[in-house]
Regions:
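N-terminal Sec/SRP start-transfer signal
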Residues: 2-43, 56, 61
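Hydrophobic, regular-secondary-structure patches
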Residues: 43-119, 144-145
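Short aromatic/hydrophobic contact patches that present stacked aromatics
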Residues: 69-71, 148-150, 216-218
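The feature marks short, hydrophobic/small-residue-biased sequence motifs that occur predominantly
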Residues: 102-143, 175, 198-201
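Short, solvent-exposed hinge/capping segments at secondary-structure junctions
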Residues: 132, 151-165, 207
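A residue-level structural signature of the nucleotidyltransferase/glycosyltransferase Rossmann-like core
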Residues: 147-148, 196
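Short conserved beta-strand and strand-loop elements enriched in small hydrophobics
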Residues: 161-177
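Mechanotransmission and gating elements of multispan inner-membrane complexes involved in transport
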Residues: 172-238
């Protein structure tokens, strides 16, 4: 007992206890807020990434509604004269989903006292039904009658067009044909929805006065990731 040394313990006052308690509590809340801050930041990042991916996917789907995976044009001429033979050869390639000969031209659409420059795209009725994944918001996608036309939703709004309306399509050569609006479509891509009019391929051939020709051939494949391999086969048959 003689070797033991005693130290006097200082009495803790209420003020000192309060200061210590406050620092402990503050640090605890600082830690909580730090964790919450990180959690919120990560959540915002994940949500933003998800939205971004969703928007990107929607954009790609909108573009591919009208845009093919492979687009074939004639280097030597503005037109394909014997496009039917080319189409049949391409259809034989494994992995091809649709082959769509098209006849398109910048034209003027007139209706309800209004006129607007549009891209008139001539596509066969069969390819409109089976080759295009058009979302029809009014009417239908049947353009089997020669005087049929489908217009984009924004274009219909701008020109106050309704299903059943009669309109005129005027070519760059100032040739005019009368058409009836059969349907209104929406792709989700503004350039298409506000500037595109789809008419029967034969009607565009008549309007252009070039006979049975096409300006391009669009090709859609079953597996887009394999498009490079299919492209090399397409080159061999055209």
């Amino acid at each position: 007992m003689k070797n033991l040394k005693w130290r006097r313990v200082k009495k803790v006052t209420m003020v000192e206890f309060f200061i210590a308690f406050r620092h402990i509590i503050e640090r605890k809340f600082q830690s909580i807020f730090s964790v919450l801050g990180v959690a919120i930041a990560v959540t915002v990042f994940i949500v933003s990434l998800t939205v971004s991916n969703g928007l990107e996917k929607n954009m790609i789907n909108s573009l591919l509604t009208m845009s093919p995976h492979i687009l074939v044009k004639n280097k030597k001429s503005k037109f394909f004269d014997n496009y039917e033979g080319t189409v049949e050869n391409v259809k034989k390639i494994k992995g091809i989903k649709a082959v769509i000969p098209q006849m398109n031209s910048q034209s003027i659409l007139k209706g309800n006292g209004l006129a607007k420059g549009v891209l008139a795209d001539g596509i066969s009725p069969e390819n409109v039904k089976n080759g295009l994944n058009l979302k029809i918001v009014d009417g239908n996608n049947n353009i089997s009658e020669l005087n049929s036309v489908l217009v984009g939703e924004q274009l219909a709004t701008e020109m106050n067009l309704k299903v059943g309306n009669e309109i005129s399509l005027v070519s760059a050569e100032n040739k005019e044909i009368k058409l009836i609006v059969r349907g209104i479509f929406k792709t989700g891509f503004l350039d298409y929805d506000s500037n595109l009019a789809i008419v029967p391929l034969e009607a565009m051939q008549i309007l252009s006065d070039q006979g049975r020709v096409a300006t391009e051939i669009g090709i859609k494949v079953e597996h887009p990731e394999k498009v490079e391999g299919i492209l090399s086969q397409v080159r061999n048959v055209i």
